[in-house]
């Protein structure tokens, strides 16, 4: 872009008298035409603004002539007023038109410099994938669905009854201390396990019942191996002939199918208020150490009774496991918090 210094030099205009009454129409027309030509030479918006001030500002010849109108006779005022109005209008119109033209030129230059070269190769599309916790959940569900179980879900905001009372955990029971619970009030809370789904299912359905209950649960705990929100998958089977031997076989087969290898599985006696007998399940790792992976047991007769099921006729077993725990073992991850930090560098490894 060229920026000639002479474009704002008013010496290019004809020299006229500073006294208005010494001018005639021809001189003013010549002045106006010269000003319009000067305006057309300006190729820079900033210089055009400078020229606007010089041609129409307080110190311009045009303003100086206009100030003398009060000294003229009425007839001269009419004559010179018409001439000066024509001069000012033409100069203002020329300035406005040139500014619009320069703005268009500047915009086109900017658009040209920012244009997209469509001949360049495009960036490849990025594919998303499931979260590792979701993939592990689906892997677990796939096994149990093939084994004849249905998937059941329930509310995450639960009543104290479904989360504790119906599961044989009364308000005075010491097992309550095992649950650092998020309470809304004395009656409602964030569920600490997915066991309430089992209660709701048994209340609404007659045996035989075969369900798994995956979902989010909440406990007031947070460290390298615990999170205030995590995922559980629990299972329940109630029939007229459910046995602990059947439970052991189901869990052992599930663990070997999940980890896709033969495992040494150990069942240790334990205690849960809602099952009797109860057991913790361990597997032997490659270093010869036992790893606790889940809990299980035969459904306590009182729990069946609470749900309106005849405990003399039916028996059942239940089991539960932490999905993040299985994900950590499956992928070799030692920090549970990585699953919840949304770090793409971590998550993209599972695509």
Swiss-Prot record:
Reaction catalysis annotation: tRNA(Phe) + L-phenylalanine + ATP = L-phenylalanyl-tRNA(Phe) + AMP + diphosphate + H(+)
Keyword Nucleotide-binding applies: yes
Subcellular location, record wording: Cytoplasm
GO cellular component assignments: cytoplasm
Binding residues for Mg(2+): 276
GO biological process per UniProt: phenylalanyl-tRNA aminoacylation
Pfam families in UniProt: Phe_tRNA-synt_N, tRNA-synt_2d
Subunit structure: Tetramer of two alpha and two beta subunits.
Family stated for the protein in its record: Belongs to the class-II aminoacyl-tRNA synthetase family. Phe-tRNA synthetase alpha subunit type 1 subfamily.
Designated name of the protein: Phenylalanine--tRNA ligase alpha subunit
């Amino acid at each position: 872009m060229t920026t000639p210094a002479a474009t704002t030099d008013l010496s290019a205009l004809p020299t006229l008298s500073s006294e208005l009454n010494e001018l005639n129409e021809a001189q003013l027309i010549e002045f106006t035409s010269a000003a319009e030509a000067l305006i057309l030479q300006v190729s820079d918006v900033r210089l055009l603004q400078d020229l606007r001030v010089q041609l129409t500002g307080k110190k311009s010849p045009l303003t100086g002539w206009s100030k003398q109108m009060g000294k003229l006779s009425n007839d001269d005022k009419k004559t010179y007023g018409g001439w000066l109005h024509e001069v000012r209008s033409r100069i203002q119109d020329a300035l406005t038109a040139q500014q619009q033209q320069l703005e268009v030129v500047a915009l086109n230059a900017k658009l040209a410099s920012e244009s997209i070269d469509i001949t360049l190769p495009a960036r490849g599309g990025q594919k998303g994938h499931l979260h590792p916790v979701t993939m592990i959940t689906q892997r677990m569900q796939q096994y149990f669905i093939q084994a004849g179980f249905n998937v059941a879900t329930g509310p995450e905001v639960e009543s104290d009854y479904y989360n504790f009372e119906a599961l044989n955990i009364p308000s005075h029971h010491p097992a309550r201390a095992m649950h650092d619970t998020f309470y809304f009030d004395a009656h409602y809370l964030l569920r600490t396990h997915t066991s309430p789904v089992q209660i709701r299912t048994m209340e609404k359905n007659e045996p035989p019942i075969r369900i798994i209950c995956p979902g989010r649960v909440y406990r007031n705990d947070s460290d390298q191996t615990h999170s205030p929100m995590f995922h559980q998958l629990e299972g329940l089977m109630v029939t007229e002939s459910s046995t602990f031997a059947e439970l052991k076989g189901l869990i052992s087969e599930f663990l070997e199918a999940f980890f896709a290898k033969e495992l040494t599985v150990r069942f240790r006696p334990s205690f849960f208020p809602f099952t009797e007998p109860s057991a913790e399940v361990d597997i032997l790792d490659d270093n010869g150490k036992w790893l606790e992976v889940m809990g299980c047991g035969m459904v306590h007769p009182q729990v069946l009774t609470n749900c309106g099921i005849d405990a003399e006729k039916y028996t059942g077993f239940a089991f539960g496991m932490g999905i993040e725990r299985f994900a950590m073992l499956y992928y070799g991850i030692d920090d549970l918090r990585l699953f919840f930090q949304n770090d793409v560098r971590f998550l993209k490894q599972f695509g």
